[in-house]
Amino acid sequence: MMTLKKIADVILPTRWADFNLLAFQCADEDKHAEGEPAETVLALTLGNIHLAPPLVRIHSQCMTGEVFHSMRCDCYEQLHLALRTIAEQGAGVLVYEHQEGRGIGLIEKLRAYQLQDQGLDTIEANLRLGHPVDLRNYSLSVEVLRFLNLRSLQLMTNNPEKIDAVRSAGIEIVRRVSADVPANPHSAKYLATKRNRLGHLVSSTPGFPNAGNYFARRASPPDLGDDAVNTRPATLHLLQTPSRKR
């Protein structure tokens, strides 16, 4: 049985808004009996999340993208997109899970990167290392949403598994909000693999002259149209990025 406990609640000023940062500890009785430590998960909340179905993003930790700004993935841009959009709407939740590398951990993720440098895609690399394609489990995120007493929400995601996890918990998704961000020459293959082999709902993204500048400036609010959950994926648009000085 899973028990969720809030252990901290602080104000977190950001460039977009002052969020409340909640820290949770989850004790799974089965894992506790085996001596495993309690899992932790974070949630950033903003505004009154019960006046209307709030915008919610379930986001997995990515040290390479979010700390070192790696261009191999879209994690950094998706995190900023979610926080900025929540701030623009005035209310919302971002659940931040510690599931680095789709659940295989940082070191194994870097080993997978080595194989990708040799030509394998993200799926082939995981399988070569003996890992599942995606080891993540969203039960902890769902428990956070239940703790926050959310019965309906707008879910920002391109991942059908997150949609299924939320719906299976009996939480209504009134709208899927696209988590598309501009591709770059380093992330194009990765995003195409997510679309074509993992079934992610990656649709076309508008072109910008400089991907690096897109999230460094105050861009216009994204079109949050009434995206259907079964939105068909479309073509990715590559961006030219300036060469780095060495």
Specify the residue positions occupied by each region the protein language model found:
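Catalytic domains of riboflavin
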Residues: 1-224, 230-246
